[in-house]
Each structure stands twice: as structure tokens, then as C-alpha cells.
Design a protein with these regions (language model features):
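Active-site proximal loop and beta-alpha junction motif in alpha/beta enzyme cores
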Residues: 1-46, 51-235
Length: 235
């Protein structure tokens, strides 16, 4: 618990890592407490860093464990392992339609056909190529409403494609955004009238997420891979 009082240290580690998110977790009883930091500060909900924590716990800290519960700023989050997939259960964001503005067009570099507000601004674009080829003006994106900018369109090989931009959190582009799909998945599941969708995040790194709804929750599944094991020296 003393570890989690060192918020300044966590922020500095996240800044030094300079990745979209750095996760900090500690075991408390049978559960884990989990917090996430970007180079620009703390977030209340993060997907792929949660999946990464579950991967480490299940494969290194508690080998053979197939279910992990996390206590977070967004309440209890769970991760269940099914083969090589890790299934996360997150709260869905309620989407409110908003007017498409010239400011959105100027910032994004394309005119949305629809726009919605949850925690983030969700902009639906004309087609997949527009999403993939987008070069937004991040100096203008930072002035749009919403914490992050989510852009999405119907996909050709998957149900939808998306990208996530987070200059307010000092993250130009998030490679794969789990919390973003708490906006994106509810939209496309309703739009396509499907029970489940396959979503592709079309960032330079890219990633596939399998999504379905469970009441007011989004159930997302994805894969994880070990990149490095390292020591951090705090002075």
C-alpha cells in the first residue's frame, strides 16, 4: 500500500518509459490493485495494459492461474484466459450523439459522418482507407471535447477499423486501445446488429480485438506476447 502512495514515482516511471500506458499492480488478498499512467498522467480505464498485467500474473507470478480480478478506479475488472486469448470485462461508455463541427474536420483531416461523446470523442468516418491514411493535426485534436479521440469506420476484412489519438495525455497515437473499444464496440454491435464483432486497430503496430456486449459491459478478447523483462532503478 505504501507502493501506491508514490504517485509521483509512478508518473515519472511512465514519463521515462514514454509508452502509451504503464501499469502498476500489487496483490491484495486474492485480488490485485491496478493503476495506469500515461506520460501525461493517470487514467481511470485502460485495456491493453490490463491485459498485459494479467499475462504477467498468469504466466510468471501465479503460473496456471486462469482468472484475475483487479480493483481499479473503474471498479472491479476481470480477465479470464481461454487458450491463447485473454478476455477482459469492462464497463461500456454511454454514447451521446453530438454535432459534427468544422473544428472536428480541421483537427481530424476528414469530415466525420457521425460523432458521439462518451469519455472520449468517437467520430465515424466514411471508409476504412480514410481511417488508415489519416494524419490528424494533434495541436488541434487537443482542443476537441473528450479525453481521447477515437476514429472508426466499417472494415473490409474485419467488422470495423479504428485509431486512437490522445495528445491530452501526451500520447500521439495509442497502438491498441481497449477502453476505446468500450465506445467503438457498442456502436458497431448496434449498427451492424451483431452479437459479436471483430475489430482491428489500424495503428502502425496494429491489433485485433474480439468484442461482444454483456448488458452494460463490453467483453473484449485479445492475445499477448512478452517483449522484455527488465529492472527499473528508482533514485
Amino acid at each position: 500500500k505504501i507502493f501506491f502512495s508514490l504517485m509521483m514515482v509512478q508518473e515519472k516511471i511512465a514519463m521515462e518509459n514514454n509508452l502509451s500506458e504503464t501499469a502498476f499492480t500489487v496483490k491484495e488478498g486474492e485480488r490485485y490493485r491496478l493503476r495506469w499512467f500515461t506520460p501525461g498522467g493517470e487514467l481511470e480505464l485502460v485495456g491493453h495494459a490490463t491485459l498485459a498485467c494479467a499475462y504477467v500474473i498468469m504466466n510468471f507470478l501465479e503460473k496456471g492461474k486462469e482468472h484475475v480480478s483487479f480493483d481499479t478506479l473503474s471498479g472491479e475488472l476481470t480477465v479470464q484466459k481461454y487458450g491463447d486469448l485473454y478476455e477482459m470485462n469492462f464497463p461500456a461508455y454511454e454514447l451521446t450523439p453530438v454535432e459534427v463541427t468544422q473544428e472536428m474536420t480541421d483537427a481530424i483531416g476528414a469530415t466525420p459522418i457521425e460523432a458521439y461523446m462518451g469519455r472520449d470523442l468517437l467520430c465515424v468516418l466514411q471508409d476504412e482507407d480514410t481511417v488508415k491514411n489519416l494524419t490528424p493535426n494533434l495541436d488541434k485534436v487537443i482542443h476537441l471535447d473528450g479525453l481521447l479521440l477515437q476514429v472508426t469506420a466499417k472494415g473490409s476484412e474485419t467488422d470495423c477499423v479504428s485509431r486512437t489519438f490522445a495528445p491530452k495525455m501526451k500520447v500521439p497515437e495509442d497502438p491498441v486501445c481497449g477502453s476505446g473499444h468500450c465506445h467503438i464496440a457498442p456502436y458497431w454491435i448496434q449498427k451492424l446488429q451483431k452479437d459479436e464483432i471483430v475489430a482491428y486497430q489500424a495503428s502502425p503496430r496494429g491489433g485485433t480485438i474480439y468484442c461482444k456486449l454483456d448488458g452494460d459491459r463490453v467483453v473484449m478478447s485479445g492475445k499477448a506476447a512478452l517483449y522484455s523483462i527488465a529492472d527499473i532503478f528508482v533514485r
